[in-house]
């Protein structure tokens, strides 16, 4: 089987990445719907698109093939027209569209070509678009928008030669996974060539990609958070370890505090070089508040080593932790809120970051890390950074370096 996914680290030279260009779903956000849709603010779409285009240009300028989930999903339906009606059925079912609107919605969505249909599924559909006027106080949508599709890190995760197709924590976001699931099962580029290590219909437990960090070819680090459970990690690990082509033997599970600051592991902790990590001070200041587990073929056990000791053991060298916001409590809080730890590596020691996090950027540069910056006045309103907005599909394998 020809390999279509190759991600054995967070820092290997990035060759192919999957993103979503912000669309009309941004303009369907209202202050009243933010909590329901798990978004933190109302961005200005035109500026968000410009910021995102600048972000993807940096990646292309650095030799990265940039793929878009909306285009891949549409291409899949173009390649396999027989899938279209079944996919529409699935979307209508998972969007929880009321029975009285289903026929009208189906007629509307079916009238669009595949690309416009996928974009409309993501954007959401207002009742007024279908000529339904129930008054100002009525709920405005037949199908809710999916603004978090912007964050392609979460619905699935590339691990080694395969992926996890995640069961997400909220009903609001779980519908996002139907697009990559369609692509990896049926797109001519990927079909029958990508092993699944987790399935979106495993409903008992949840796991999200923002909690999964691919440290190297043997070890993963996964956060146990509000959105990712230890049982889900164990279920994923069992399938991963039992794949004869998998090189993985260990998962370090960090049982983090279940708070907004620790929503996902990558909101507080990211790998940026062979021996360098960026972390919010809370992850170390609260070290006594969470447990660390090691998951292996032998089972799950609590370990008493510190996180730095575990990282050094796994990396085979002493590691350096760069504190987001430095030692300034105010700066650390502000920059963590604006995704200061959430950078994406183009290669070892070269990352893309939001330019607004200038304290952290200065510390990174002083530590020898090359930092490319992007504007983020609008992109940051969703509380996700460059790592959140990207899912690597191919990274070059890391070269061993002398210690």
Curated annotation (Swiss-Prot):
One Gene Ontology cellular component annotation held by this UniProt entry: cytoplasm
Chemical reaction(s) catalysed: L-arginine + H2O = L-citrulline + NH4(+)
InterPro entries reported for this sequence: Arg_deiminase
Places the protein is found: Cytoplasm
A Pfam family it matches: ADI
Keyword hit for Transferase: no
Active site as annotated: 388
Domain of life: Bacteria
GO-annotated biological processes: arginine catabolic process to ornithine; arginine deiminase pathway
Pathways involved: Amino-acid degradation; L-arginine degradation via ADI pathway; carbamoyl phosphate from L-arginine: step 1/2
UniProt entry keywords in alphabetical sequence: Arginine metabolism, Cytoplasm, Hydrolase
Enzyme Commission number(s) of this protein: 3.5.3.6
Enzyme class (EC, first level): hydrolase
GO molecular function: arginine deiminase activity
UniProt-listed NCBIfam families: PRK01388.1 (NF002381)
HAMAP family with a match to the protein in the record: Arg_deiminase
Family of this protein: Belongs to the arginine deiminase family.
Protein name: Arginine deiminase
Organism of provenance: Mycoplasma capricolum subsp. capricolum (strain California kid / ATCC 27343 / NCTC 10154)
High-level lineage: Bacteria, Bacillati, Mycoplasmatota, Mollicutes, Mycoplasmataceae
């Amino acid at each position: 089987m020809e390999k279509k996914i190759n991600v054995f680290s967070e820092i290997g030279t990035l060759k192919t990445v999957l993103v979503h260009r912000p669309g009309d779903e941004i303009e369907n956000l209202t202050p009243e719907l933010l909590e329901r849709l798990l978004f933190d603010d109302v961005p200005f779409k035109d500026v968000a698109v410009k910021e995102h285009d600048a972000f993807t240009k940096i990646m292309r300028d650095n030799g990265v093939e940039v793929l878009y989930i909306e285009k891949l999903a549409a291409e899949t339906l173009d390649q396999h027209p027989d899938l279209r009606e079944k996919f529409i059925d699935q979307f209508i079912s998972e969007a929880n569209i009321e029975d009285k609107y289903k026929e009208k919605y189906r007629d509307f969505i079916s009238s669009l070509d595949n690309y416009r249909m996928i974009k409309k599924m993501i954007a959401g559909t207002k009742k007024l678009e279908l000529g339904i006027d129930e008054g100002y106080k009525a709920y405005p949508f037949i199908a809710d928008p999916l603004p978090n599709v912007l964050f392609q890190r979460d619905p699935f995760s590339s691990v080694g030669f395969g992926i996890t197709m995640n069961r997400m924590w909220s009903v609001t976001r779980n519908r996002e996974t139907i697009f990559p699931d369609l692509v990896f099962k049926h797109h001519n580029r990927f079909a029958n060539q990508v092993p699944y290590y987790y399935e979106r219909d495993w409903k008992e437990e949840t796991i999200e990609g923002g909690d999964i960090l691919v440290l190297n070819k043997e070890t993963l680090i996964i956060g146990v958070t509000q959105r990712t459970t230890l049982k889900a990690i164990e279920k994923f690990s069992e399938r991963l370890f039992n794949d004869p082509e998998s090189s993985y033997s260990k998962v370090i599970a960090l049982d983090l505090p279940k708070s907004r600051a620790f929503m996902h592991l990558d909101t507080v902790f990211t790998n940026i070089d062979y021996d360098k990590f960026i972390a919010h001070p809370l992850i170390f200041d609260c070290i006594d508040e969470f447990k660390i587990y090691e998951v292996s073929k032998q089972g799950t056990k609590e370990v008493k080593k510190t996180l730095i000791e575990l990282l050094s053991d796994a990396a085979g060298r002493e590691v350096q932790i760069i504190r987001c916001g430095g030692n300034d409590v105010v700066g650390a809080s502000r920059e963590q809120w604006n995704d200061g730890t959430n950078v994406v590596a183009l290669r070892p020691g070269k990352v893309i970051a939001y330019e607004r996090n200038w304290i952290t950027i200065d510390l990174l540069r002083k530590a020898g890390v090359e930092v490319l910056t992007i504007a983020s006045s609008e992109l940051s309103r969703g509380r996700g950074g460059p790592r959140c907005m990207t899912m690597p599909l191919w990274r070059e394998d890391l070269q061993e370096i002398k210690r």
